[in-house]
Amino acid sequence: NKQLEIDIQQEINECLDNFESFCFDAGAGAGKTYALQKSIEHILKSEGEILKLSNQKILCITYTNAAKNEILDRLGKNSSVVVSTIHEFLWGFIAIQQELLTEEHKNKIKGELEKIEQKINGNSLSSNVEQNEFRERICDEDFLKVFYSVSSSPAKTFKEVIKGFDEYFSPYLSSVKSFRDFVKDINKKYKLGITLKEIEDKKSKKVIYNPVQNRDKLENYVISHDTLLLYCENIITSQNLLKRLFSDRYPYVLVDEYQDTDEKVVNIIDSIREYSNSKQNFVVGFFGDSLQNIYGSGVGVLPNKEEYKSIEKIFNRRSSSQIVELIEKIRNDNFGQQSIYTDFDNGSYNFYVADDNFDLDIFLQENSLINNTACLLMKNDDISKARGFDELLSALKKFPRFSGGNYENVTNEFLQTNLQQMGWFLRDVLTFIDFIQKSSDPNSTVKEIVQFISSS
């Protein structure tokens, strides 16, 4: 088995030597990161001097900062290797292309304005309001301060405060929800309209990517993680010059945990690969496992996988034969994973059938499993109860962003250790908590407090 593992790494090395793009699939515990490390070391050993002379680099794209740091720890620092999260790298690559970014920003704003116009036209107030006069009233800074101060208040309180500010609004408050939506949409339309005119008049500001908050502020030329990927996809896939600059600078691109990579990123890399195919001087290696897709935004199965050489590693270096056998039953995709060891035979597993009245604590006690037992819970409600944040989750589910058809956002944006995936709402909550902690800490500096205020 160990010789077969060596042969698999040799197969990867040959793809790198021949600039043949590949997809390396390996199950849990197979040593994907180890294979990635060995691949980089192979390139450095065989092509390291040429890379330095040509001012070229190996690009290793990771999904999280934790993965980035792990790879850097294993490799050590090397000037010929760039290990970066995809957002960090893409912004560094595209930030200088302000003319192209501004054009994308203009198109994005136009698209948003179309959506807002549809919402305005669909609002029950649209036929009863003279928009220009209404806009002048609601875009007043004093009104907006009052409006947002009571935006989440009960309907009765909201009506009283708004009427108290200006009796003009009284006829439009029969439906508080319609009024709130109408004010927000008209105000957003007004602000985006100003920014669009600036761009069309060639008076635009620089487009900026904010890695801290996953929320667009298009009127301020600030874009979030998702919008950065959208802009980069549109720009790079349509610009052969940028594809050439990319492939000339980074002839070796290795993508860690490809299954969690956004499809827009895969499209970018795929377009560069197709552009460079005839030159035989660019290779892409995707490392991962389609069934270990954690984040909702990831591709899972690699698109156009048939265009990449498929390399599979079925060996598990981490677990006993019994665990590997159990994993195979759960995967149920005939991957055929097996332990790399012939003498790692330890433990057993059993299946139990339970009904809706199942009680985990009673089950563990009756089966003498109280000690040395780890439990994998599948439902968010069960996880939150076991970890002691069930009240927080219950409160969160009252927000439209995390209820009904949007319930999957609880997993995608809330139950996250990866800050890049965390939604703007919770990111802002964490930022505010951080501010409270800093402001009450006697060791905090004025600079730290000011930084929070300026970024909020």
Q: Model-derived features: where do they sit?
A:
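The feature marks helicase ATPase cores and/or their adjacent C-terminal helical subdomains
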Residues: 1-456
